[in-house]
């Protein structure tokens, strides 16, 4: 256990540069402060939302369902979010050769990696469980042993979803390693798994039943989303059900660690193996400096399973939204989303929806860090700094085009919009796209991380990626909130915001082009 904690401590310091931040005058300190403020604000927002949701259940006379509901929602959130980072933390890392040479067991290695992932998911679990528990205690009189079991169960909630997703992710990587186009197969299988998770969530939320028995319908929806949450229902026996949940979670976790550690070296080698097929050979051609750098950036992005899965997720959602809008009637989409006048809603909020999903995809925020220890090649290349910057931004803009064009076409075909709304749909998402791309590259240039063990650390958990994501969401939410609270037309606020973002992007782009080296 002592060596497991030592390995965990080392990985934690690699993930979060605590020692560098503590140094006086370090540039990462400002980014860490922004990240802390943004993370705290997001956590408080989720806590407030969970309190309101639990309060709604209590007002409906279904306060006994609060524990099961919070377990179900938090487990689903952990399951969904872990799918983006499981393999990047557990398997296929560059530090395996170093770890294998140390006098540690495989169980200690995978235990430390799993503990790192558990710590991040525990925060999600507590954000749901603690606010819901407060409302539950205030609404339902419960005995002290049951309350202690409920609070203890919060620490066991992430275990089963993490083990399940880790096993699925490993199977995807192992299955795709037998194919020539490994990354394409991995992405297809991963997106299929995400689609299945989304389908289960939607199906569970539309369970039919006797409308006179609201409690039975809610219980069916909760257990449909996450079956183990049924152990927290009163019908499961109270303390017996919660205790059984803790025992099952511990047993699943122990079994996963035992099975995985027995074959960890072989599984890790297989996860990092390349295709057995030889690569195709292409004739050498001359290209302009920009074209050559752009092709290199584009090839590196699409050759990285982790980068495409995470940085391309927003664009994928936008493409799925476009297909659904073309295939299904807008009224049916409104029924699924709980929106009565879907045509009027989308006509007003279409620029916000497109901009929000584009803001989720920002490969430029990790483009510099992904150069790794080979960054000296770019820094010493006889190429203008503006060309280097343009090539990295072009990949981000091209990725956004894959989602922007289908979304705009589908919205224009299916919805009836005024000329001003059409102009906003065409221009406002472009401003957001340019801003988020320039902001991501600007942050990554100021706070790079060239010494990484796994691409997942750079693509998903680095300061520039997280700060750019938070900034993008703030820029999307701010106009909507201003429109709601100040009773100002949304489109007018969006046009003003787009102008501000365009000016900010121009300033950051000018500063990047004035650099001596990347």
Give residue ranges: language-model regions.
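Hydrophobic alpha-helical transmembrane segments of membrane proteins
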Residues: 1-96, 106-376, 385-518
């Amino acid at each position: 256990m002592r060596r497991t904690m030592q390995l965990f401590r080392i990985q934690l310091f690699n993930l979060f540069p605590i020692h560098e931040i503590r140094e006086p005058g370090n540039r990462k300190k400002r980014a860490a402060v922004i990240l802390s403020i943004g993370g705290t604000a997001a956590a408080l927002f989720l806590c407030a939302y969970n309190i309101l949701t639990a309060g709604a259940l209590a007002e409906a006379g279904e306060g006994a369902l609060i524990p099961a509901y919070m377990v179900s929602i938090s487990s689903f959130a952990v399951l969904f979010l872990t799918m983006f980072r499981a393999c990047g933390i557990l398997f296929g890392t560059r530090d395996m050769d170093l770890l294998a040479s140390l006098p540690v067991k495989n169980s200690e290695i995978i235990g430390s990696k799993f503990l790192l992932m558990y710590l991040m998911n525990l925060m999600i679990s507590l954000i749901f469980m603690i606010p819901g528990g407060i409302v539950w205690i205030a609404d339902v009189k419960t005995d002290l042993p049951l309350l202690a079991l409920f609070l203890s169960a919060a620490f066991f909630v992430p275990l089963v979803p993490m083990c399940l997703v880790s096993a699925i992710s490993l199977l995807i990587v192992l299955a795709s390693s037998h194919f020539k186009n490994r990354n394409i197969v991995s992405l297809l299988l991963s997106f299929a798994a995400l689609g299945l998770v989304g389908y289960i969530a939607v199906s569970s939320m539309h369970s039919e039943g006797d409308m006179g028995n609201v409690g039975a319908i809610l219980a069916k929806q909760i257990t449909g989303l996450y079956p183990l949450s049924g152990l927290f229902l009163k019908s499961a026996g109270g303390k017996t059900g919660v205790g059984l949940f803790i025992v099952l979670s511990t047993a699943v976790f122990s079994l996963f660690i035992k099975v995985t550690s027995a074959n960890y070296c072989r599984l890790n080698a297989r996860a990092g193996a390349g295709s057995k097929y030889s690569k195709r050979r292409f004739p050498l051609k001359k290209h302009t400096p920009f074209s050559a750098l752009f092709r290199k950036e584009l090839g590196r992005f699409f050759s990285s399973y982790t980068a495409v899965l995470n940085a391309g997720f927003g664009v994928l959602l936008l493409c799925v939204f476009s297909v659904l809008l073309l295939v299904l009637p807008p009224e049916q989409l409104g029924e699924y989303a709980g929106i009565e006048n879907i045509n009027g809603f989308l006509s007003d909020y279409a620029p916000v929806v497109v901009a929000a999903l584009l803001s989720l995809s920002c490969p430029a925020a990790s483009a510099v860090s992904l150069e790794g220890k080979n960054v000296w090649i770019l820094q010493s290349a006889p190429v203008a700094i503006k060309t280097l910057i343009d090539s990295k931004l072009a990949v981000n803009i091209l990725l956004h085009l894959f989602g922007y064009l289908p979304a705009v076409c589908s919205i224009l075909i299916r919805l009836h919009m005024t000329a001003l709304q059409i102009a906003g749909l065409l221009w406002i998402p472009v401003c957001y796209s340019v801003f988020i791309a320039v902001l991501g590259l600007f942050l990554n240039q100021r706070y790079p991380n060239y010494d990484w063990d796994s691409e997942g650390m750079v693509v998903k958990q680095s300061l520039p990626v997280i700060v750019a994501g938070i900034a993008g969401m703030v820029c999307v939410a701010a106009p909507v909130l201003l429109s709601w609270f100040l009773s100002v037309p949304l489109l007018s606020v969006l046009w003003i915001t787009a102008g501000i973002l365009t000016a900010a992007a121009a300033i950051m782009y000018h500063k990047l082009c004035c650099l001596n080296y990347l």
